Regions:
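Asp-based, Mg2+/Mn2+-dependent phosphohydrolase catalytic module
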Residues: 12, 16-115
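Proline-centered loop/turn at the N-terminus of a beta-strand
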Residues: 3-5, 80
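A generic structured-segment signal
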Residues: 1-3, 89
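Conserved phosphate-coupling serine/threonine residues in phosphotransfer and NTP-handling enzymes
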Residues: 8-10
Length: 115
């Protein structure tokens, strides 16, 4: 089935608190902020570790993000990259970063996954 994770460059405790406050504790199977022993994005180490913990290969993983750092992280991990326009950066920045797909709403992602 579909598994969801969050990887943030924000401090770990802050990332977990924000995500669980907004989405609840059951939405994501993994939430990870910056941990001192793991390199920051766009280094792929953390996202590859998370994918492995969730039983996913890079080839079957969508890395969804709102910045050029997110696109670079996904590409560095050999994952499919989706840029979202409702976050930190706009469409042009995501296109320039090389996102495979750019979407304007969460519904577009769900429709893509369901197809």
């Amino acid at each position: 089935g579909l598994k969801l994770a969050v990887l943030s460059n924000k401090p770990h405790k802050q990332a977990v608190h924000v995500v669980e406050t907004i989405f609840g504790k059951e939405t994501f199977q993994w939430i990870q902020g910056q941990i001192d022993t793991v390199p920051r994005k766009p280094d792929p180490t953390a996202v590859l570790q998370i994918a492995e913990k969730l039983g996913a290969t890079p080839e079957e993983t969508l890395y969804i993000g709102d910045s050029e750092v997110d696109v670079a992280t996904g590409k560095n991990a050999q994952m499919h990259t989706v840029g979202v326009t409702w976050g930190f950066r706009g469409k042009e920045v995501l296109e320039d970063a090389g996102a495979e797909l750019i979407v304007d709403s969460p519904e577009e992602i769900m429709n893509m996954i369901e197809d």
